[in-house]
Regions:
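C-lobe/activation-segment region of protein kinase-like
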Residues: 302-304, 308-370
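Terminal C-lobe "cap" of eukaryotic-type protein kinase domains
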Residues: 377-407
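Phox homology (PX) phosphoinositide-binding domain
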Residues: 1-187, 196
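Activation segment signature within eukaryotic-like protein kinase domains
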Residues: 268-269
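Conserved short submotifs of the Hanks-type protein kinase catalytic core
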Residues: 220-233, 237, 241
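Catalytic-loop of the protein kinase fold
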Residues: 276-297, 303
């Protein structure tokens, strides 16, 4: 679908990675229960907000559905008697707000379909599993050599992506992973160019990219088949998790997660960087690197879901790099994502936030120096190293790789130009989103500063000074006016003195009465 084409009927080009925030604005009593009015907002614009009304029982159901994550969420306890009391309702409302905050601020919980339905029922009312089954059934009717073994429910975080374990009837012992995914808001390739790009990916056979065996795209979705790794992803390896389990169960609160040995960090990191360099040199943009998108096959790391950028689905780490305006290219996004991945390989968990200037104690100082070059405040402001510069760091430069020949992806000039145009459009959308977010943050800081106690005191002092200055100026004005009024009489007196002449005086006669009367 090109930029000028309209999306398929009923299709919503919604970016599921845009954060949702929720604030309980009020509560209302209706007969035997209380309803809470929740204001939900997508992104930073207050114009993109709506209200949902929820009862305590709805919050309780949400909490129960999220218990699989292994995290104790701060849901206020139930109360059967006295639950209509005004003070109790106010206290419960504060507790429910804390419950919502803990969910919307958690990077995995906030992306779950259960939470999205709770906060945004209008946009998440579709049954994506049913839609995927319909699409997959149509595919199997056209290609009978494939057979579905079982659906793999909730193994990935994407709401609009479903997985199935399948087999090839001609090779019944082999297992394959079929995924169906809805095309996303960053799809900027035309249908024809997208088909050419997917054909290119299915033809690739290089060490550091997971092979894509089959692909089929429609106007609104794509169906993909690749080998299934029983050992799971790199994140499964770090978390000591089984690949077929729910992602919330595996990754929200892993009990056995552990960082890798230095030798593994060096080898895996170098192989992943070589995979990124291969894509960049071929003009193929990625932007979706994380430990769940890397599999380890006999000691070799392979990048998965390379097609995500072409299909237009948003990056899992988009909320993390969007606030950082220096990360505004797909290559920069890949380096940023590599920093996240390297941190997780080192410490056994992803970083809580970025920029990051303080690191836990680590036995590998060489790793920390590379992390600082990517994730520190200075790096995020001034710029990060390129993939080639990372390969040349002491941490990765001495890693011995097995292949001897130079790897490359041969892309036709027409497709390369289409990929370049799509890449520029993707980066333009990111930069526009960063601009809007930057303006919002500046406005928020200004408003916060304006309302701070220190600023209020400063304005009061300034107002007093202005008041005193104004009073002083008023006094001066009165004095000047008085001087002006008396100035006329003074001038007349001076004038009469200067023009005095004796001749103008009238002659007067007087009787001399000094003599005594006789």
């Amino acid at each position: 679908m090109s930029l000028r084409e309209k999306p398929a009927p009923g299709r919503l080009l919604l970016d599921d990675t845009v954060p949702l925030t929720a604030v309980i604005e009020a509560s209302q009593n209706l007969q035997s229960h209380t309803e809470y009015i929740v204001r939900v907002q997508r992104g930073v614009s207050s114009d993109n907000s709506w209200q949902v009304i929820r009862r305590y029982s709805d919050f309780d159901v949400l909490n129960s559905s999220l218990m699989v994550c292994g995290i104790s969420l701060p849901l206020p306890p139930k109360k059967l008697i006295g639950n209509m009391d005004r003070e109790f309702i106010a206290e419960r409302q504060r507790g429910l707000q804390a419950f919502l905050d803990s969910i919307t601020q958690h990077p995995l919980l906030c992306s779950s379909l259960t939470v999205k339905k709770f906060l945004d029922p209008n946009n998440y009312c579709a049954n994506y599993t049913e839609i995927a089954l319909q699409q997959v059934s149509m595919f199997f009717r056209s290609d009978i050599k494939w057979e579905v073994l079982e659906p793999l429910r909730d193994i990935g975080w994407r709401i609009r992506k479903k997985y199935f374990l399948i087999k090839n009837k001609e090779q019944p012992k082999e297992r394959y992973l079929l995924s169906w995914v809805d095309l996303g808001p960053d799809k900027f390739l035309s249908d024809k160019d997208l088909q050419s790009a997917m054909k290119l990916l299915t033809s690739l056979s290089v060490p550091y990219l997971c092979p894509l065996l089959f692909s089929s795209t429609s106007e609104s979705s794509a169906l993909l088949i690749r080998p299934f790794s029983e050992r799971g992803s790199l994140r499964d390896h770090i978390c000591k998790a089984k690949p077929r389990e729910s992602y919330l169960r595996k990754y929200c609160n892993p009990k056995k997660s552990q960082g890798l040995e230095l030798s593994q960090i060096k080898l895996y990191g170098r192989q992943i960087l070589e995979g990124l360099k291969l894509l960049h040199d071929g003009g193929v943009f990625h932007g979706h690197l994380h430990t769940s998108n890397v599999i380890v096959d006999e000691g070799v790391c392979r990048l998965m879901d390379v097609e995500n950028g072409m299909l237009g689905v948003p990056s899992a780490l988009r909320p993390s790099f969007t606030p950082l305006r220096k990360i505004n290219t797909t290559e920069g996004v890949d380096v940023f994502c590599f920093g996240h991945l390297l941190y997780e390989m080192t410490y056994g968990r992803p970083p809580d936030s970025v920029p990051l200037d303080q690191y836990p104690a680590a036995p590998y100082t060489a790793v920390v120096s590379v992390l600082q070059s990517i994730l520190s405040t200075e790096a995020c402001k001034s710029g990060m190293p390129t993939v080639l510069e990372l390969i040349r760091t002491p941490l990765f430069s001495d890693v011995q790789l097995h292949q001897s020949e130079k790897l490359q992806i041969k892309v036709s000039s027409r497709l390369k130009e289409a990929l370049k145009t799509a890449k520029e459009s993707l980066e333009k959308r990111l930069q526009e989103e960063q601009r809007v977010l930057h303006q919002h943050r500046r406005l928020t800081r200004a408003q916060s500063h304006h309302g701070s106690e220190e600023e209020k005191k400063r304005r009061k002092i300034l107002a007093r000074k202005k008041s005193r200055q104004s009073a002083y100026e008023n006094e001066e004005d009165v004095s000047v006016r008085n001087n002006n009024n008396s100035g006329g009489g003074r001038a007349a007196l001076l004038s009469s003195i200067q023009t005095f002449s004796k001749g103008k005086l009238k002659k007067s006669e007087s009787a001399d009465r000094s003599k005594p009367v006789t």
